[in-house]
Amino acid sequence: MAVPKRRNSKTRGAKRRTHYKIKLSSVIKCSNCGAYKRPHRVCPSCGEY
């Protein structure tokens, strides 16, 4: 059975977890109504593409 050979330090564990962050989705303003929407999707407020 696999067991850790040595204990990892707090810093090493934190460095490994730097890639666990949530990606921010890109948002743009709708050219029709000015509301924020995701690119290449229908605007939720006015329905314009």
From Swiss-Prot:
Question: GO terms for molecular function, please?
Answer: structural constituent of ribosome
Q: Which UniProt keywords apply?
A: Ribonucleoprotein, Ribosomal protein
Give the CC-aspect GO terms. Answer: large ribosomal subunit
Coiled-coil features, chain-numbered ranges: none
The record, for Pfam families, names: Ribosomal_L32p
What Gene Ontology biological process does one annotation of this record name? translation
The similarity comment for this entry is:
Belongs to the bacterial ribosomal protein bL32 family.
Q: What is this protein called?
A: Large ribosomal subunit protein bL32
Query: What is this protein's gene name?
Result: rpmF
